Amino acid sequence: MVCSITKLAQKLISIPSISPKDLGCQDIMIDFLDNLGFEIKKININDTKNFWATRGFGKTLTFAGHTDVVPPGDYKYWNDDPFNPVIKNGLLFGRGSSDMKGALASMLIASERFIKKNPNYEGRLSFLITSDEESSAIDGTKKVIDYLISRKDTIDYCVIGEPCSSSKIGDVIKNGRRGSITANLTIHGIQGHIAYPHLADNPIHKGLPIILKILSIKLDDGNAFFAPTSVNISNIHAGDGINNIIPGSLFVQFNFRFSTETSEKEIKSKFTQILDNNNINYSLNWFFSGNPFITKKGLLIDNITKSIINLNKVKPVLSTDGGTSDGRFIASMNAEIVELGLMNNTIHKSNEYVRISDLEKLAIIYEDIMYRLLT
């Protein structure tokens, strides 16, 4: 017999909600929460669907997540249709099963169980759901947070269902994330025949020593929560593949993942200082993804840790590694934030799956967190 969590997860996975399209996932969630007595506010912007659901009053525990998924890629690498969820040997396969429709199903079932047992709980239980997490993240959680701040609304504790477990549910939880900023640098030269270099200005030759200087930038040593700030090249391009032309420009894209020891301003200053000291013609633009954030030990981490130890017999490791998450937007509300979800070993891969037993384990832990913070 397929349990209610699995059925709900299958229902969500069967919808091809490639970011930022929701295509009906949130309608399923909204109907579910409406039946539990939640007040729902839809905040839809352009192609993005968002909603904010609340039940109760007082200190607010929010469960946050996203209904969008990354594209499945070439179907030939899947054993089954990625949007036709199938169960094999206790595993539920499908795009979004781990990231993060399985966790959404666990959240919903956990809230249903909690409310049935504790209909008059103290405080407020809420959901913040978006369909724009995997792509631009422009019209998603950020806009919902802007709306909540404009209304002077609050979030005290937030559990984000991102898949950060490694080998056992809850063995790794995220209590922060690094900041991210991208530099798009174009070094301009003069195109010419490669046999007459004195009549051209090769931007690759000019750019190579500058690239090495940028890669050697040391911004900080990190701290107890974060590794040192890092810089990596993500894209580089010059020329059109012709072997007798000196290209007219060199494009290099750098990404910085930065700790709380360094600011966006400091990164930009060090970067442009290197460029300006080398007398080159360049153009530069930046894309800022978000600042780092950290939740230090407090009520949320303490209670989540106790839940995981008691219910899954493992002590969680606190981590801030990995990519950015929507926690960077929620952090602006001064909330305590922890990311706790399913396994991350198959996310964004073909044949993504989740163990059905893990859906139930996660729901039990989520329900216990509700009990600890709202009763």
Swiss-Prot record:
InterPro entries: ArgE/DapE_CS, Bact_exopeptidase_dim_dom, DapE_proteobac, Peptidase_M20, Peptidase_M20_dimer, Peptidase_M20A. Binds 2 Zn(2+) or Co(2+) ions per subunit. Zn(2+) 1 binds at residues 66, 99, 162. Pathway: Amino-acid biosynthesis; L-lysine biosynthesis via DAP pathway; LL-2,6-diaminopimelate from (S)-tetrahydrodipicolinate (succinylase route): step 3/3. Gene3D superfamilies: Zn peptidases (3.40.630.10). Belongs to the peptidase M20A family. DapE subfamily. Catalyzes the hydrolysis of N-succinyl-L,L-diaminopimelic acid (SDAP), forming succinate and LL-2,6-diaminopimelate (DAP), an intermediate involved in the bacterial biosynthesis of lysine and meso-diaminopimelic acid, an essential component of bacterial cell walls. This is Succinyl-diaminopimelate desuccinylase. The lineage of its organism: Bacteria, Pseudomonadati, Pseudomonadota, Gammaproteobacteria, Enterobacterales.
